[in-house]
Structure formats: structure tokens, C-alpha cells
Amino acid sequence: MRRIGLIALFACALLLWAGARFIADRFAGSVPYVPPYTQSLQNKSTEPLSTFLPWLAHVYEPFSPTPTPQGIPDPVVQAAGAGLVNMTTRQTLWAANPDGSEGIASLTKLMTSLVARENAASSTIITIGAEDLNVDSVNKDLRVGDRFTLDEAFHFLLISSDNAMAKAVARTVFHGNTSAFVDRMNRTAAALGMTHTSYEDPVGLGRDVSSVSDMAILARYIENHYPDLFSFSRYAHLTMMTEQGRVFELTNTNVILNQIPGIIGSKTGYTPEVGGSLLVVFETQKGKFVSIVLGSPDRFGDTSNILSWYSHSASDTLNAGN
């Protein structure tokens, strides 16, 4: 009996010790609790984050600031928010109002493209419907019944920033439920840790808002997981013919596209209410970078000033890319 009592006492002590360790690990302020299965998923960078909602919020660590070299003035910009981030080292090289929520207009189409890529095959057929054409469309030649693969549709979204195509993609990918598509956009933003971001529609004509820091997170995720999305945006001009023999001429809305050495991809945004936005991903010998301008009366001038500032401050040349 005495031996049985000792064994029981030892078992109780072991249970108390294990419980104390669990509570310490669970509630320690310096180590946030993450479910065990989520920890293993965090190491699989090829998995879409939206697959594991909502547990993967803030998986990516915040970008950290880097002091500006002494004697070099900050770039002159008119934007409400702007910044330059080294996506390779995760360093913010310069930023102004990086966490302020600003209207982003058609930068929304980056998230639209990401959600579509994660939830539909490249060969998915996008058919233009009458409901898609009740919005101002860049390409006036689009007609009801025009058919495109999803990859072809991405060219419309990311080169000419076509609004009707964005509506058609969202409607098709979620089987007619555009509201569910927008909900997935917001859930994906939350999973990525984009805490200053909110989407109302897949086009960018509503009150879609984000911040410089959040757009840097999105750009890094796209480049790391779906780099083809940025490659779609790299054409200054593209002639596309559909299976029905219809020809479409797509012109890039980024008018300084060919003036940026090493460019990987870009996306513009503009409405009279929120002003102009421009996100540019480029590569140099020191890594991959993203320049972001939000709410600017001169988005192209601001971006040019940021890139010029970087060339002088970092002693790096923008010539390692395409």
C-alpha cells in the first residue's frame, strides 16, 4: 500500500509540473501562444496563408526601420504615406506615415489577384457578364460573353487595371458570390497581419484602405509565393487575342514603367477622392525592394524621387533586374 501511495503521489506531482509548464508557455507575455499544428505550418512558406485562417494572423514579423545615412536628406514626396522597404532583409529604409490608413484605389486589385490565384486554376474561364459592365471600364471593347482564362484576366487587372474584369474575376472565382470573395480578401489581409487594411469591393472604387507597411507585407507575400502576378504587370503594352478572335490592346497605367531599371512589377491606383497610388517592386544587387506611395497628387514624381534617393543613399545602382 505504501508503494502504491508513493506512486500516486509521484504521478500527482508530475501532473502538477506539466500543468504549470503548460500555463507558463500559454500565457507568458514574451512568447505568444500558437497552436502546435500552426507552428508546423509556419515553416511551410509555400502554403497559402488564407488556407489556415484565422490562426496565422501576424505570421510575418513587422518590417524594422533602418537609420537614414547622415547627411542625406529624406526624399521629397507629396504623398499622404510613402515608404521604401528591402523585402530581402525586411528593413524599412525610409517611410513617412507608414501605418496611416489611406485610400488605395486600384491597388486593391493586387489582393483581388492574390485571392483569385489561391482559389482558382489558371485555366478557369472568366466570362464577362452584363453586371460586370455597369462600372467604368478601362477597355471599352469588352462585351457580354467575352471569354478569357484567369491568366489572361490577370493581364487586364495588372496592366490596364480594368474594373469590369476585376468584377468578373471576383464573381466567377466564388461562383457568383462577390461578397464572399471580398470577405476572403479581408480574411487574407488579417492572416497576413495587415492591421490597417479593409476592403469593400474587388475593384478599388469603394472605401478600400491600407497603409504603406501593410502594402509592403502584401507585396512581399505575392513575390515570395506567386511571383507570376507581378510578371503579368511588367508589360508596357500587350496585344491579346481571345479564342473568339477578338483583339484587345492593353496599355500599362504605370507611365514610368520603362524608366525603372530592375523592375519586377508594379500596380497603380487613382480616384479623385483618394488621389494617386503606386507600388513598385524592383531588384538590385542588394536584394528586392518595394516602393509605395499612397494618396499623392504626383505618384510618379514621388516614386521617382524615392528611387533617386535610394540610389544616392545606399550607393546602389538600379540595374540588376530586367
Residues covered by each model-derived region:
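Structural motif marking the loop-to-transmembrane transition
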Residues: 1-7, 100, 150
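Domain-terminus/edge residues, biased toward the C-terminal soluble/receptor-binding domains
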Residues: 2-7, 17-24, 29-54, 194-195, ...
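Repetitive helical segments and hydrophobic/amphipathic motifs
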Residues: 11-12
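Active-site-adjacent loops and short helices of periplasmic peptidoglycan-processing enzymes
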Residues: 25-216, 220-224, 285
